[in-house]
Amino acid sequence: MDERRTPSPCSSRPSSPRTPPCEMFGPVGIEAVLDQLRIKAMKTGFEFNIMVVGQSGLGKSTMVNTLFKSKVWQSPAPNLDVPMPQTLELHSVTHVIEEKGLKLKLTVTDTPGFGDQINNDKCWDPILSYINQQYEQYLQEELLITRQRHIPDTRVHCCVYFVPPTGHCLRPLDIEFLRRLCRTVNVVPVIARADSLTIEERDAFRSRIQQNLKNHCIDVYPQQCFDEDINDRLLNSKIREQIPFAVVGADREHIVNGRCVLGRKTKWGIIEVENMAHCEFLLLRDLLIRSHLQDLKDITHNVHYENYRVLRLNESHVLPRGPGWVNLAPASPGQLMAPGPEKVRKRSKDPRDDEC
């Protein structure tokens, strides 16, 4: 029986060939390319699309505002007269953030209603459908014969999953969600409201979560198979040891010892968001913005979107020609909610992979 093969995410990112260096007689100005890239980046800016998933009351909106130090997302005031939504609803908001002349077009997608129902069966389907709809929209734009010079990128580059601070282990809902979504999008789990746990409880909770992820073969970002060199391996190994980050969100400033800090004021003191002794928010911000933002976008395009594109092209046997463009057969709801490949092949065989 013929078995349909899914593309390998790792094989979608070809490694650079080992070409011997050429001896040069003098400088030719190659370093000026960096200036060209910088000037172009200053003109066009960047796009980054992030999704936050978690139950109500875990501080998702506050965390997004804290990450970008802007009022990106306004939390609606609690209203007891408004009934809880019976279905998961996705809401997106887009802002342009500018820092030192560089513009970032940020789109944040919230998922109110996730995990809030008595029966949460298949509550991940709307999220999975939304992610694949963005892939489908980008694919349809790519297939146009006369297409835009710059295709608008609405694909989700990162999904931050907020784990409730129960102090025990991952719930079945958490495991099922992570297992399905990790095949389709970059997922970064965090321990929400970590100030409700002691340092000992937090470390023990993290260890149990890491063991849960290993037992269920859930490969969250950054995946080991994407480490391209020794520097990536060293940096990402430290990150993998600390995931999920224990975070606290706050968008208000307080005066502590004569300095202004972001934090939450409590009866026993102020929890400083940017103090590693209080929480690991800095690690999350460094991962999402300062060190891995472009890598998140590259993996989205070269791995997750490429998997979706190849599967859609394989499933569409006929490509009917329209007036000036080529259109795939419409994606069915089942295709939009289908998870990605079960398992990815590694560049080099790792004996630890056999455990999964």
From Swiss-Prot:
It is found in: Cytoplasm; Cytoplasm, Cytoskeleton; Cytoplasm, Cytoskeleton, Spindle; Cell projection, Cilium, Flagellum. Residues 1-23, 330-356 are annotated as: Disordered. Residues 44-315 form the Septin-type G domain. Keywords: Cell cycle, Cell division, Cell projection, Cilium, Cytoplasm, Cytoskeleton, Differentiation, Flagellum, GTP-binding, Nucleotide-binding, Spermatogenesis. GTP binds at residues 54-61, 87, 113, 193-201, 249, 264. Residues 256-356 are annotated as: Self-association (via N-terminus) to polymerize octameric septin 12-7-6-2/4-2/4-6-7-12 filaments. Belongs to the TRAFAC class TrmE-Era-EngA-EngB-Septin-like GTPase superfamily. Septin GTPase family. This is Septin-12.
